[in-house]
C-alpha cells in the first residue's frame, strides 16, 4: 500500500484536530473585560443578523408560523429557538480558514478568492441550517436535539471536507 495516497487525509485530520485544540485553549484564556464586552457585542450583532436572514428564508420558503424577536424565534406550542454565539458558525469557518492556510501552495490572490467563496458557502449553509432547525422545532420538536447536536455538526465538516477536496483537486 502506498503511504503517499494517505498523506492528504492525514494532513486534513491533523490540521482539524490541532486547530480544534487550539480553539479550545484560546477560547479558555481569560481576557480583559473591555475585550470580552466588545466580543460579546460583536457576536450578539452577528446573532441578530443571522436571525434576520433566517427570518427572510422562513417567510419566503415555508408556511411555518413564528414570531421573531431579535435573535429568538417563537413557535406555537411554547417552543422557541434562540440564536446564540455558538450558532454563528465561527468554529467551522475557523477550521476552513486553517485548512486553506495549510492547503496546497497557490497564488495568494487565488487562495483568497477561494477562501471568500468557501466562507460564503459556510455562512449560507448556516442560514439554511438555522432555518431547517426552526422548521423542525415548529413541526416536530422531538427531532430538534438530534439535528442540532449531531446531524448539522457532521454536515458542516462534510462541507468543509468537500470544499477542501475541491481546492486540492483544482
Predicted regions and their residues:
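Hydrophobic N-terminal alpha-helices or hydrophobic patches in metabolic proteins across all domains
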Residues: 1-170
Amino acid at each position: 500500500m502506498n503511504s503517499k495516497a494517505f498523506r492528504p487525509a492525514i494532513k486534513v485530520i491533523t490540521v482539524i484536530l490541532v486547530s480544534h485544540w487550539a480553539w479550545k485553549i484560546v477560547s479558555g484564556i481569560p481576557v480583559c473585560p473591555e475585550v470580552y464586552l466588545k466580543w460579546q457585542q460583536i457576536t450578539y450583532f452577528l446573532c441578530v443578523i443571522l436571525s434576520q436572514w433566517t427570518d427572510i428564508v422562513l417567510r419566503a420558503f415555508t408556511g411555518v408560523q413564528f414570531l421573531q424577536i431579535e435573535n429568538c424565534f417563537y413557535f406555537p406550542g411554547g417552543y422557541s429557538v434562540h440564536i446564540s454565539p455558538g450558532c454563528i458558525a465561527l468554529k467551522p469557518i475557523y477550521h476552513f480558514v486553517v485548512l486553506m492556510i495549510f492547503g496546497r501552495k497557490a497564488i495568494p490572490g487565488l487562495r483568497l478568492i477561494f477562501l471568500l467563496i468557501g466562507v460564503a458557502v459556510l455562512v449560507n449553509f448556516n442560514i439554511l441550517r438555522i432555518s431547517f432547525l426552526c422548521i423542525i422545532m415548529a413541526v416536530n420538536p422531538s427531532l430538534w436535539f438530534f439535528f442540532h447536536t449531531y446531524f448539522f455538526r457532521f454536515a458542516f465538516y462534510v462541507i468543509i471536507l468537500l470544499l477542501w477536496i475541491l481546492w486540492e483537486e483544482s
